[in-house]
Amino acid sequence: VILAMKKSLRMTEGSISQKIIFFAIPLFLGNLFQQLYNTADSLIVGNFLGSNALAAVSSSGNLIFLMVGFINGIAMGAGVVIARYYGAKKRDCLQKAIHTTVAFGLVAGAALTVLGMLLAPKILVLMGTPADVLPESIVYFRTYFAGSMGAVMYNIFVGVLQSVGDGRHPLIYLIISSCVNVVLDIFFIAGLGMGVGSAALATAISQFVSALLCMVHLLRVEEEYRLELREIRFDSSMLKQIIQNGVPSGFQNSVIAIANVFVQSNINAFGKMAMAGCGSYSKIEGFAFLPVTCFTMALTTFVSQNLGAKQYDRAKKGARFGVFCSITIAELIGIIIYVAAPVLITAFNRDPDVVHYGVMQSRTIALFYCLLAFSHCIAAVLRGSGNASVPMIVMLCDWCLFRVSYITVAVRILPDIRVIFWAYPLTWGISSVIFLYLFLRGKWVYGFEKS
């Protein structure tokens, strides 16, 4: 299947459903492997190092997304610009956009490494991380960010490849890095008896491997999106476009992450068993999010390429098809998780209290995955049309401000952890109504004509 996939896909011609599905399949498989090796960290840590170490890894997840999310958002914006020029067949602009994006990634990766290592202790303390978990959380966080350049550049290179419709090569490289990560996890923790920091070290090494493989491919490919090391520099006009499209997406990621860090700090108040149980659920939720992730990526590329080629009706039809597929699959997975929650949580940790919290969160949230899928897909369509500021505003008002306000008030009225869990379905429902209105208006189709 992987070898049969084309190197790149022009979304502007051929069957709409086939183009989206053929592009989404490698994205799905790639995200599946990424989630598997993220889950491998938690499974190995939870079973070999215990609840404290599992809580440390779990508490670091939202914080890592906060630090990395903004840069990944910029990369998403860059992908929109690259896809637009690829769809319009403007080679010179395409080359400038790619090399400016890579230059940004190098600078951002260096800055992220320094900030992540310096700010780790202070932020974890502000999150209310329990004292018995804090030392291991700091070690995990600092080790991860010491190697964050690999994560940043991997996302940059994958963004370039996906924006020209190449999902095959990122998938192959991700499978390789996933295997490296799992083998190193087992070797460091089970074999050498190293601590929680070794799980982060294994992740960092595997990300460098995947970034290097992507870079070598871009340097060797004989296509208009070929990378030339001597051409890596900032082009002011391209940087402006990337920032215009990327900052709203980056800010949106940061807004979501800030809200999730706030949620995590409230969960931390219920103790390390709640932290471990909810952390286990978050790994399971990552699998449910896979169809959402692959269709959002596919939709952003599809819409951007077709609007760049001025094929407005085709962009609309593709958007409707992608949204329908995503919400259907996400809801089916949600039902499975609701039913199988006890078995799934037990795989991470057999402590009854850990299982209790994990199952409780699973059965509060899982049946509402269709709302999450819908919100993210419409946000992806808007980003692909050059309207990245619109989903940013919706996420800021709903997923951040309203979610934080709700939890702040609700927990004081009813100090039950389920009150925190309900924040997610509630805010997903509100954003879905708003995005449905924006999508049906149809003005997003002409977003590029304003820029």
Task: For each feature predicted by the language model, list its residue ranges.
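Transmembrane helical elements of multi-pass membrane transporters/channels
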Residues: 22-41, 143, 154, 177, ...
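Helix-terminus/linker motif at the lipid-water interface of multi-pass membrane proteins
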Residues: 32, 36-55, 124-131, 187-194, ...
